[in-house]
Amino acid sequence: MADPWQECMDYAVILARQAGEMIREALKNEMDVMIKSSPADLVTVTDQKVEKMLMSSIKEKYPCHSFIGEESVAAGEKTVFTESPTWFIDPIDGTTNFVHRFPFVAVSIGFLVNKEMEFGIVYSCVEDKMYTGRKGKGAFCNGQKLQVSQQEDITKSLLVTELGSSRKPETLRIVLSNMEKLCSIPIHGIRSVGTAAVNMCLVATGGADAYYEMGIHCWDMAGAGIIVTEAGGVLMDVTGGPFDLMSRRIIAANSITLAKRIAKEIEIIPLQRDDES
């Protein structure tokens, strides 16, 4: 039986490359930077242009599908997540990196049907790395098959996370306290590249053993989530329960063992869900 969503995935890869070219061109020029929810939550005209290109191109080809995009939600659209085929679009994951020309900037496209991940595309466009994952068919980077690491001993692990965009003192206290608790176990280290999607893809490559974060959004996770699971990894809530795309929090790890060990250390940050906004 033919794969009903392969054509969608192939089209998404083409569009991600086009978006990446737009971003690389924009990096050569001066940019207008605007502030969203906090002084560390930035948006540029390029974010909006790239999302408009992606949304309009996909809507023209698949008018019956649903769409959730970062900049559309920022402009006031509701996050309505149903069983219908739904595209999750983050035009520039790592906008602060983009603004500073720090070379980790990604286009993220996730596609879900019946609320299950079917495929994900993460194009780290400065690096020219195209990460893809298709349900039941594996995860790849530039055509090379990905496999998570086998390191389940947290004392020998390398984790990735972010400080996040909130600058509220209590939120920062929890974020830094969680990092301190994990480092004190001890572990080999914690790294940050400034984009949730690329952080998750690094788990899929085996370069990092796990990633955790609270305060991100569904469009940050929808593309990379299936890349992690198709590389042999797991997605889990930071409480140790099942992963919930709308919860704004995640552990993406090489194994249930490591994910649960991380969850044991984490203090939870109270967050409004994406589907409550």
Curated annotation (Swiss-Prot):
Where does the protein principally reside? cytoplasm
> Which domain of life does the protein's organism represent?
Eukaryota
Q: Where does Mg(2+) 2 bind?
A: 90, 93, 220
GO biological process: one example? inositol metabolic process
Catalytic activity field: a myo-inositol phosphate + H2O = myo-inositol + phosphate; 1D-myo-inositol 1-phosphate + H2O = myo-inositol + phosphate; 1D-myo-inositol 2-phosphate + H2O = myo-inositol + phosphate; 1D-myo-inositol 3-phosphate + H2O = myo-inositol + phosphate
Which GO terms label this protein's molecular function in UniProt? Answer: fructose-1-phosphatase activity; glucose-1-phosphatase activity; glucose-6-phosphatase activity; glycerol-2-phosphatase activity; inositol monophosphate 1-phosphatase activity; inositol monophosphate 3-phosphatase activity; inositol monophosphate 4-phosphatase activity; inositol monophosphate phosphatase activity
Protein name according to UniProt = Inositol monophosphatase 1
Q: Does the keyword 4Fe-4S apply?
A: no
Cofactor(s) essential for the protein: Mg(2+)
Q: Which family does it belong to?
A: Belongs to the inositol monophosphatase superfamily.
Pfam families referenced in this protein's UniProt entry, alphabetically = Inositol_P
Going by the UniProt record, its keywords in alphabetical order are:
Cytoplasm, Hydrolase, Lithium, Magnesium, Metal-binding
Which of this chain's residues are annotated to bind Mg(2+) 1? 70, 90, 92
Activity regulation, short description:
Inhibited by Li(+), Ca(2+) and Mn(2+), but also by Mg(2+) at concentrations above 3 mM.
Q: In which tissues is it expressed?
A: Mostly expressed in brain, small intestine, testis, kidney, and spleen (at protein level).
Which GO terms of the cellular component aspect does the record hold? cytoplasm
The encoding gene: Impa1
Please describe what this protein does. Phosphatase involved in the dephosphorylation of myo-inositol monophosphate to generate myo-inositol. Is also able to dephosphorylate scyllo-inositol-phosphate, myo-inositol 1,4-diphosphate, scyllo-inositol-1,3-diphosphate and scyllo-inositol-1,4-diphosphate. Also dephosphorylates in vitro other sugar-phosphates including D-galactose-1-phosphate, glucose-1-phosphate, glucose-6-phosphate, fructose-1-phosphate, beta-glycerophosphate and 2'-AMP.
Induction line: By lithium Li(+) in hippocamp.
Q: Does the keyword Protease apply?
A: no
Query: Lineage, please?
Result: Eukaryota, Metazoa, Chordata, Craniata, Vertebrata
Q: Where is this protein found?
A: Cytoplasm
Which positions does UniProt annotate for substrate binding?
70, 90-95, 194-196, 213, 220
**Broad class of enzyme this protein falls into:** hydrolase
